[in-house]
Amino acid sequence: MFLAQEIIRKKRDGHALSDEEIRFFINGIRDNTISEGQIAALAMTIFFHDMTMPERVSLTMAMRDSGTVLDWKSLHLNGPIVDKHSTGGVGDVTSLMLGPMVAACGGYIPMISGRGLGHTGGTLDKLESIPGFDIFPDDNRFREIIKDVGVAIIGQTSSLAPADKRFYATRDITATVDSIPLITASILAKKLAEGLDALVMDVKVGSGAFMPTYELSEALAEAIVGVANGAGVRTTALLTDMNQVLASSAGNAVEVREAVQFLTGEYRNPRLFDVTMALCVEMLISGKLAKDDAEARAKLQAVLDNGKAAEVFGRMVAAQKGPTDFVENYAKYLPTAMLTKAVYADTEGFVSEMDTRALGMAVVAMGGGRRQASDTIDYSVGFTDMARLGDQVDGQRPLAVIHAKDENSWQEASKAVKAAIKLADKAPESTPTVYRRISE
């Protein structure tokens, strides 16, 4: 038997906690036998003293084990259980293509996703722009969809990593969110509860990233790879660029439209293609569905070319109560904004810099995201035809096309776009989409 205050004291004095001490504390968070003050105190001591790798693994596994851990053995699946997690960005719609692409190659992807947070878009919000789409199927239905379709994208239920929910709520109001061991445990507790064989992390870098600097993004990626592998799940991470909007669009319905166009081959943004393919390659190799990069890319390109990936997406939408003909008739089903109009730069030039975070907040301000949990989302608003770094803009080439609910909203958004995009006399040097791969 342990005392919470003695565990806090031990960490306060700079000592490493044992696995048993960490499990006692996390179980107490779940059972409400540990107070909010005690959670805050431990979080602050971890913030200042960090954690060793064994402590980080113990914390993550204790949080994972605070609730249900999915077990797929009874389904006798003939492929690996794999997933991807992104630290979030703007126009980051990779999940909607990646899940079906990997499923079409023989993987099973039980993706538990989140809503928009701050300036970043949420996969669940995007999917809810599809009429009828059910993000909370019951457990049996979730398992059926995984077995039959190969991929389902759902919301987090209260039974998955419940200790994380309470721990995070306290961190949020005590300035202890940005601690790498705590971020790592929070992300991985939920992902490892999916019962995965392999995981790839997409850690964003740049003006629209969760972490403010390249070095911190790199440190987070290394921590996640170390802890997840320590917890027994084959994990790699990619550091990918978020110095500009990833897709050509940012919003909810507009990103779903782009995802369908990507899968069917109607239109593929080259940067979005690069990042999506790179993440899928990691999933296929870690999941032992391909032996190397070349084989993985060939398999992925094949399921795009032969329509299998698009077919899997359509089957997932139908299985989660969306329209059965969504892929064929997406334009009929997705909501459209009242006003769609381009915004142009005041001068000619080359796009040299983009405040991606500000563009994400502009989508939120238009109604495309939540400022507080009770807000309702306008799924139709957002940006399309976004200019990319290096593009020449003038009276013919707009900065973006704005989808707004009215003229006032359009005016505010156009000001935000102009303020967020800087122009120069010559094009900047191109930057990579993937900066670094991190493995154990």
Swiss-Prot record:
Reaction(s) this enzyme catalyzes, per UniProt: thymidine + phosphate = 2-deoxy-alpha-D-ribose 1-phosphate + thymine
Family: Belongs to the thymidine/pyrimidine-nucleoside phosphorylase family.
GO cellular component: cytosol
Top-rank lineage group of the source organism: Bacteria
Biological process terms in GO annotation: pyrimidine nucleobase metabolic process; thymidine metabolic process
Pathway: Pyrimidine metabolism; dTMP biosynthesis via salvage pathway; dTMP from thymine: step 1/2
Keyword line: Glycosyltransferase, Transferase
Gene Ontology molecular-function annotations: 1,4-alpha-oligoglucan phosphorylase activity; thymidine phosphorylase activity
Gene3D superfamilies: Nucleoside phosphorylase/phosphoribosyltransferase catalytic domain, Pyrimidine nucleoside phosphorylase-like, C-terminal domain, Transferase, Pyrimidine Nucleoside Phosphorylase, Chain C
Gene designation per UniProt: deoA
Classification via SMART domains: PYNP_C
Enzyme Commission numbers on file: 2.4.2.4
Organism of origin: Shigella dysenteriae serotype 1 (strain Sd197)
Name of the protein in its database record: Thymidine phosphorylase
Entry-linked PANTHER family: THYMIDINE PHOSPHORYLASE
Subunit structure of this chain's protein: Homodimer.
Role, per record: The enzymes which catalyze the reversible phosphorolysis of pyrimidine nucleosides are involved in the degradation of these compounds and in their utilization as carbon and energy sources, or in the rescue of pyrimidine bases for nucleotide synthesis.
